[in-house]
Every structure is written in structure tokens, then in C-alpha cells.
Amino acid sequence: MKTKRYFCEKFNFMKFVKNTVLFFLTFSLFIQCKKEIQPETKSGVKNEITYAKGLEIYKYEGYTIVKITKPWPEAKENFIYVLQEKNGIIPDSLKRLTIVPIPLQSIVVTSTTHIPALEMLGVENTLVGFPNTDYISSEKTRKLIDVGKVREVGTNETLNTEVLIDMAPDLIVSFGLNNNNPTIDNLQKSGLKVIYNGDWTEQSPLGKAEWIKFFGALYGLDNKANTIFKEIEKEYTNTLA
């Protein structure tokens, strides 16, 4: 009986050890898989934005994550986009998001506040459409309008979906007053890429100015955008001194 009890206890102990090992192996694999599907939490990646409250930019090898946290006042939802460089590999966990290949070759913007950033970066020639072009007063961009390089695309409230689909720009940069924007929904359903820009919600001058980094990221001109913003920051600081 003692011998039988001994073997039974030994068998139960070995079974316990085996189950314990299997548990830790399974747990280890679970943790490893969890890390693999959350690459955006890599350590050491910092937000490139300092002053703007509604914008975050995180740069990774081969792609950039742009997060719009305040596209309109009282916004409850964040909008996250992935800017994919040529041959850049996007993690599976990010493929459900809007992916925009960069650098852009054509763009439609919807606010006159977007025009100066394009001109400072030297990419105004990529502008192919704008709502209410009569509102644009910039000499550089007006020349593009006058020669027919920038098309009229309706109004902000009712963008001309048919014209935009025909143009097929790489990206439409829009803005919203709230989360009810059926025109934007229709454009996205048509396969067009749309990104919200919330520069108009910023309360500080430097916060508004820092959105040039948003456009810099779209064109792969991050360094140029940073240099321009540093000059703006310096001039603003000197003015206050």
C-alpha cells in the first residue's frame, strides 16, 4: 500500500509539474503574441509635437503615426492615421487604420489656413483642388488657380463628390465642426483618403503654427517643417521678450 501510495503521489507530482510548465509556456507565448500585435507601444518613440494640443506625431522606421485628438471642439474621438513610406512595412495591428502612402503627389485642402504651410514647404504645386477658390488670396496659389491647376471642388459643407472622385487626389485634408459629416463619409466610402486637420481649434499661436509639422509629415519633409517651425518659435519668443 505504501509503495502504491508513493507511485500515486509521484505520478500526481509529475502531472502537476507538467501542467505548470505548460501553463508558463502558454502564458509566455501569449505575452509574446500580445507584444507582436501592439508595435505602436515601442519604447523610446516620443511625440514630435510640443505646443499643439490636438496633434500627435510618432515616427517609426518606414511609417509615421499621426493622431488627431481634437479635430473640433468637444471632440470625444481620436482619429489615427498611418503614413507609409515607400517600401515601408506596416504592422498588422495598424492595417485597420487609414493608410496614406507618402510623400504625397497630389492633395486637396479645404481651409485657407492650410495654404501657407504648403507654400512654406514648397509643395504648393501638388495642390489640385480647393472649395471656394475665390477665398484664396496668396499670390503663388492664385497663379495655379488662374492657369487651371487647382480645381473648384464645391464648398466645405457640400464638397463635390463626383469631381473629387474624378480627380482622385492622393489625399483630402478636411476639417469638421462635429462628428456629423456625411460628405466625408461618402468620400471615404468611394475609396478616397481623407484626414482631419484641427489647426483651427488651437488656442495658442505656436500651437496653430506647429501644424506645419502635420504637412511636413505628409510630404516626408519633417526636417524642413521642424526648421521652419523653430524659426517661427524663435521670432515669436523674441517678440514677447
Regions found by a protein language model. Give the residues of each.
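Bacterial Sec-dependent N-terminal signal peptides
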Residues: 1-40
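Generic signal for short, ordered secondary-structure residues
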Residues: 12, 97, 143-144, 166, ...
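Short N-terminal helix-initiation segments at or just after the protein's N-terminus
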Residues: 44-53, 157-159, 197-201
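A short, structured surface patch at a secondary-structure boundary
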Residues: 64, 72-165, 171-178
